[in-house]
Amino acid sequence: MHSNLPGYWLVYSIRVLAIECIRLAPEYLPFEEGWRMQQELHKKITESQTNKNRQASMIFCEHEPVYTAGARTRSWEMPQNEKVIRVGRGGKITWHGPGQLVGYPILSLGATPDVLRYVRQIEEGLINALQSVGINGFRIAGRSGVWVRNGVSDEKVAAIGVRVQKNVTLHGFALNCSNDLAPFEKIVPCGISDAGVTTISRILKRTITPKEILDSVFNSICSALEYINTCRGNV
Protein backbone atom coordinates (compact mmCIF):
# COMPACT_ATOMS: atom_id res chain seq x y z
CA MET A 1 0.00 0.00 0.00
CA HIS A 2 1.43 3.37 -1.01
CA SER A 3 0.72 6.87 0.23
CA ASN A 4 -0.02 9.58 -2.33
CA LEU A 5 0.80 12.32 0.16
CA PRO A 6 3.35 14.85 -1.17
CA GLY A 7 6.67 15.93 0.22
CA TYR A 8 9.60 14.25 1.95
CA TRP A 9 8.26 11.54 4.18
CA LEU A 10 9.50 8.96 6.61
CA VAL A 11 6.80 6.32 6.83
CA TYR A 12 6.15 4.43 10.03
CA SER A 13 3.52 1.82 10.65
CA ILE A 14 2.10 0.53 13.90
CA ARG A 15 -0.04 -2.53 14.45
CA VAL A 16 -1.88 -3.66 11.31
CA LEU A 17 -1.41 -1.93 7.95
CA ALA A 18 -0.64 1.42 9.56
CA ILE A 19 1.01 4.27 7.67
CA GLU A 20 2.69 7.20 9.39
CA CYS A 21 4.25 10.25 7.80
CA ILE A 22 6.96 12.54 9.11
CA ARG A 23 7.94 15.99 7.92
CA LEU A 24 10.65 17.69 9.95
CA ALA A 25 12.97 20.68 9.45
CA PRO A 26 13.66 22.12 6.97
CA GLU A 27 10.47 20.77 5.33
CA TYR A 28 7.98 22.37 7.71
CA LEU A 29 4.38 21.29 7.32
CA PRO A 30 1.63 23.90 6.86
CA PHE A 31 -1.07 23.25 9.44
CA GLU A 32 -3.80 23.10 6.80
CA GLU A 33 -1.94 20.39 4.90
CA GLY A 34 -1.46 18.41 8.11
CA TRP A 35 -5.18 18.69 8.81
CA ARG A 36 -6.00 17.33 5.34
CA MET A 37 -3.68 14.41 6.02
CA GLN A 38 -5.41 13.72 9.33
CA GLN A 39 -8.81 13.73 7.64
CA GLU A 40 -7.62 11.35 4.94
CA LEU A 41 -6.23 8.89 7.48
CA HIS A 42 -9.28 9.31 9.72
CA LYS A 43 -11.57 8.32 6.85
CA LYS A 44 -9.52 5.20 6.09
CA ILE A 45 -9.34 4.14 9.73
CA THR A 46 -13.03 4.82 10.34
CA GLU A 47 -13.89 2.59 7.40
CA SER A 48 -11.51 -0.12 8.64
CA GLN A 49 -13.21 -0.37 12.05
CA THR A 50 -15.61 -2.95 10.66
CA ASN A 51 -12.78 -5.03 9.22
CA LYS A 52 -10.95 -7.81 11.02
CA ASN A 53 -7.70 -5.84 11.05
CA ARG A 54 -7.86 -2.25 12.28
CA GLN A 55 -5.51 0.45 11.07
CA ALA A 56 -3.66 2.86 13.33
CA SER A 57 -1.48 5.71 12.10
CA MET A 58 0.61 8.58 13.39
CA ILE A 59 1.78 11.77 11.72
CA PHE A 60 4.91 13.48 13.06
CA CYS A 61 5.86 16.97 11.95
CA GLU A 62 7.21 20.40 12.66
CA HIS A 63 4.63 22.95 11.57
CA GLU A 64 5.12 26.30 9.94
CA PRO A 65 4.47 28.97 12.63
CA VAL A 66 0.78 29.14 13.49
CA TYR A 67 -1.58 29.65 16.40
CA THR A 68 -4.45 27.17 16.74
CA ALA A 69 -7.53 27.81 18.84
CA GLY A 70 -9.47 24.95 20.41
CA ALA A 71 -13.21 24.85 20.94
CA ARG A 72 -13.11 26.71 24.28
CA THR A 73 -11.05 29.68 23.07
CA ARG A 74 -12.73 33.07 23.49
CA SER A 75 -12.27 35.90 20.99
CA TRP A 76 -10.43 38.08 23.51
CA GLU A 77 -7.84 35.32 23.99
CA MET A 78 -6.70 35.58 20.36
CA PRO A 79 -3.35 37.29 19.66
CA GLN A 80 -3.51 40.50 17.67
CA ASN A 81 -2.27 40.60 14.06
CA GLU A 82 -1.37 36.90 14.04
CA LYS A 83 -2.60 33.97 11.99
CA VAL A 84 -5.01 31.89 14.08
CA ILE A 85 -6.75 28.73 12.88
CA ARG A 86 -9.83 27.50 14.72
CA VAL A 87 -9.76 23.74 15.22
CA GLY A 88 -12.15 21.16 16.63
CA ARG A 89 -9.91 19.76 19.34
CA GLY A 90 -10.36 20.29 23.05
CA GLY A 91 -8.54 22.98 24.95
CA LYS A 92 -7.82 26.60 24.18
CA ILE A 93 -5.18 28.46 22.18
CA THR A 94 -1.62 27.33 21.59
CA TRP A 95 1.25 27.82 19.15
CA HIS A 96 2.98 25.42 16.77
CA GLY A 97 6.18 26.02 14.87
CA PRO A 98 9.78 25.04 14.09
CA GLY A 99 11.55 23.18 16.86
CA GLN A 100 8.35 21.68 18.25
CA LEU A 101 7.57 18.00 17.64
CA VAL A 102 3.88 17.55 16.87
CA GLY A 103 2.31 14.09 16.81
CA TYR A 104 -1.12 13.14 15.52
CA PRO A 105 -2.15 9.58 16.45
CA ILE A 106 -5.10 8.53 14.29
CA LEU A 107 -6.57 5.34 15.73
CA SER A 108 -9.78 3.67 16.82
CA LEU A 109 -10.69 3.73 20.51
CA GLY A 110 -13.27 0.99 20.01
CA ALA A 111 -17.03 0.98 20.41
CA THR A 112 -16.97 2.75 23.79
CA PRO A 113 -14.14 5.32 23.63
CA ASP A 114 -12.46 6.22 26.91
CA VAL A 115 -11.03 9.59 25.93
CA LEU A 116 -9.57 10.37 29.36
CA ARG A 117 -7.68 7.07 29.40
CA TYR A 118 -6.36 7.82 25.92
CA VAL A 119 -5.07 11.24 27.02
CA ARG A 120 -3.41 9.66 30.06
CA GLN A 121 -1.71 7.11 27.79
CA ILE A 122 -0.32 9.89 25.61
CA GLU A 123 0.95 11.65 28.72
CA GLU A 124 2.57 8.42 29.92
CA GLY A 125 4.34 7.98 26.60
CA LEU A 126 5.68 11.53 26.64
CA ILE A 127 6.80 11.24 30.26
CA ASN A 128 8.74 8.08 29.40
CA ALA A 129 10.31 9.75 26.35
CA LEU A 130 11.46 12.64 28.51
CA GLN A 131 13.02 10.21 30.97
CA SER A 132 15.18 8.89 28.11
CA VAL A 133 16.97 12.26 28.00
CA GLY A 134 17.10 12.71 31.77
CA ILE A 135 14.02 14.87 32.34
CA ASN A 136 11.46 14.09 35.03
CA GLY A 137 8.09 14.99 33.58
CA PHE A 138 4.82 14.58 35.45
CA ARG A 139 1.07 15.14 35.32
CA ILE A 140 -0.89 17.78 37.20
CA ALA A 141 -4.40 16.85 38.34
CA GLY A 142 -7.03 18.69 36.36
CA ARG A 143 -4.57 19.82 33.69
CA SER A 144 -3.69 17.82 30.60
CA GLY A 145 -0.19 17.69 29.19
CA VAL A 146 3.24 17.01 30.66
CA TRP A 147 4.93 19.30 33.16
CA VAL A 148 8.35 19.85 34.71
CA ARG A 149 9.40 21.56 37.91
CA ASN A 150 11.42 24.78 37.64
CA GLY A 151 12.38 25.91 41.12
CA VAL A 152 9.12 26.70 42.88
CA SER A 153 6.94 26.74 39.76
CA ASP A 154 5.63 24.25 37.22
CA GLU A 155 6.15 24.65 33.48
CA LYS A 156 4.48 22.82 30.62
CA VAL A 157 6.76 21.05 28.17
CA ALA A 158 4.10 19.15 26.21
CA ALA A 159 0.51 20.05 25.36
CA ILE A 160 -2.28 17.64 24.43
CA GLY A 161 -5.52 18.40 22.61
CA VAL A 162 -7.63 15.70 21.02
CA ARG A 163 -10.96 15.04 19.39
CA VAL A 164 -12.76 11.74 18.88
CA GLN A 165 -15.08 11.45 15.91
CA LYS A 166 -16.82 8.18 14.99
CA ASN A 167 -14.70 6.53 17.72
CA VAL A 168 -11.45 7.50 15.92
CA THR A 169 -8.99 10.06 17.26
CA LEU A 170 -7.87 13.33 15.69
CA HIS A 171 -5.29 15.95 16.67
CA GLY A 172 -2.74 14.97 19.33
CA PHE A 173 0.25 16.43 21.18
CA ALA A 174 2.99 19.03 20.84
CA LEU A 175 6.35 18.56 22.56
CA ASN A 176 8.55 21.64 22.94
CA CYS A 177 12.05 20.60 21.90
CA SER A 178 14.16 23.48 20.57
CA ASN A 179 11.50 26.03 19.63
CA ASP A 180 11.48 29.73 20.45
CA LEU A 181 9.21 30.51 23.40
CA ALA A 182 8.55 34.11 22.35
CA PRO A 183 5.30 33.26 20.46
CA PHE A 184 3.79 32.00 23.73
CA GLU A 185 4.21 35.46 25.25
CA LYS A 186 1.40 36.74 23.00
CA ILE A 187 -1.15 34.29 24.41
CA VAL A 188 -2.18 32.48 27.57
CA PRO A 189 -1.08 28.99 26.48
CA CYS A 190 -3.91 26.47 26.80
CA GLY A 191 -5.78 29.02 28.92
CA ILE A 192 -3.47 28.49 31.91
CA SER A 193 -2.33 31.83 33.31
CA ASP A 194 -0.50 30.69 36.46
CA ALA A 195 2.15 28.50 34.83
CA GLY A 196 4.78 28.94 32.14
CA VAL A 197 6.08 26.91 29.23
CA THR A 198 9.52 25.51 28.56
CA THR A 199 11.45 23.32 26.13
CA ILE A 200 13.61 20.23 26.39
CA SER A 201 16.62 22.26 25.20
CA ARG A 202 16.07 24.92 27.84
CA ILE A 203 15.83 22.32 30.60
CA LEU A 204 18.97 20.45 29.52
CA LYS A 205 20.90 23.59 28.51
CA ARG A 206 21.76 22.00 25.17
CA THR A 207 19.92 21.76 21.88
CA ILE A 208 17.65 18.77 21.40
CA THR A 209 15.81 18.87 18.07
CA PRO A 210 12.56 17.07 17.22
CA LYS A 211 14.52 14.69 14.99
CA GLU A 212 16.79 13.69 17.88
CA ILE A 213 13.97 12.67 20.22
CA LEU A 214 11.48 11.39 17.65
CA ASP A 215 12.38 7.70 17.92
CA SER A 216 12.08 7.75 21.70
CA VAL A 217 8.74 9.55 21.52
CA PHE A 218 7.41 7.15 18.91
CA ASN A 219 8.48 4.04 20.82
CA SER A 220 7.16 5.36 24.14
CA ILE A 221 3.80 6.38 22.67
CA CYS A 222 3.39 3.00 21.01
CA SER A 223 4.21 1.23 24.26
CA ALA A 224 1.79 3.36 26.25
CA LEU A 225 -0.98 2.76 23.71
CA GLU A 226 -0.10 -0.96 23.62
CA TYR A 227 0.79 -0.95 19.93
CA ILE A 228 3.58 -2.75 18.12
CA ASN A 229 5.67 -0.43 15.96
CA THR A 230 7.59 -1.07 12.76
CA CYS A 231 9.44 1.33 10.49
CA ARG A 232 9.92 1.62 6.76
CA GLY A 233 10.82 4.42 4.35
CA ASN A 234 13.58 6.95 3.73
CA VAL A 235 15.21 8.81 6.58
UniProtKB/Swiss-Prot annotation:
The active site is at 190 (acyl-thioester intermediate). Keywords: Acyltransferase, Cytoplasm, Transferase. The record marks 156 as: Lowers pKa of active site Cys. One of its GO terms (cellular component) is cytoplasm. One of its GO terms (molecular function) is lipoyl(octanoyl) transferase activity. Pfam families: LplA-B_cat (PF21948). The keyword Transferase applies. Residues 52-229 form the BPL/LPL catalytic domain. GO terms for biological process: protein modification process. CDD domains: LipB. Substrate binds at residues 89-96, 159-161, 172-174. It is found in: Cytoplasm. It comes from the Bacteria. Pathway: Protein modification; protein lipoylation via endogenous pathway; protein N(6)-(lipoyl)lysine from octanoyl-[acyl-carrier-protein]: step 1/2. InterPro entries: aa-tRNA-synth_II/BPL/LPL, BPL_LPL_catalytic, Octanoyltransferase, Octanoyltransferase_CS. It catalyses: octanoyl-[ACP] + L-lysyl-[protein] = N(6)-octanoyl-L-lysyl-[protein] + holo-[ACP] + H(+). Its EC number is 2.3.1.181. Catalyzes the transfer of endogenously produced octanoic acid from octanoyl-acyl-carrier-protein onto the lipoyl domains of lipoate-dependent enzymes. Lipoyl-ACP can also act as a substrate although octanoyl-ACP is likely to be the physiological substrate. Belongs to the LipB family. In the reaction, the free carboxyl group of octanoic acid is attached via an amide linkage to the epsilon-amino group of a specific lysine residue of lipoyl domains of lipoate-dependent enzymes. This is Octanoyltransferase. It comes from Tropheryma whipplei (strain Twist) (Whipple's bacillus). The lineage of its organism: Bacteria, Bacillati, Actinomycetota, Actinomycetes, Micrococcales.
